[in-house]
Amino acid sequence: MKLILDSENSHPTTITVKGKEITLLLIESSILIDSSQIAKLFDKKEKTVATKVQKSKLEKYETENIKLLKNYGLMNPDAVKPRPFYDLRLMLEGPAYYYFKKEDETDLIDVIVRVAIGKHREWVHNKNIDKI
């Protein structure tokens, strides 16, 4: 799915999981994550995680707004092409579940989703207040 991102309809946020900061992209209808954040969380090579994610055939969210992603810190400043994003819950309950299960931390999935939903609600609420 193509995303048309601007600073009005998207917002980056970070959550701390296992002492590591994970960056998420909040959009109106979803909470998105890219495979590099899962790799960071489990100290895995990004390519290894990306391959596992690609095999899962999750719906990709892609954007051409490279400048905004770099401003958000969601993209390496030297990168030319942005990574695709995926729905957070589908990522955690799908390809990332393997890593959580391996470390016997599957209960963390629910915690991450709840914290992310809280961040999303706060962003939507604050955004709506700003419009008034």
What are these language model-derived features?
Residues 1-132:
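An anion-engaging/catalytic patch
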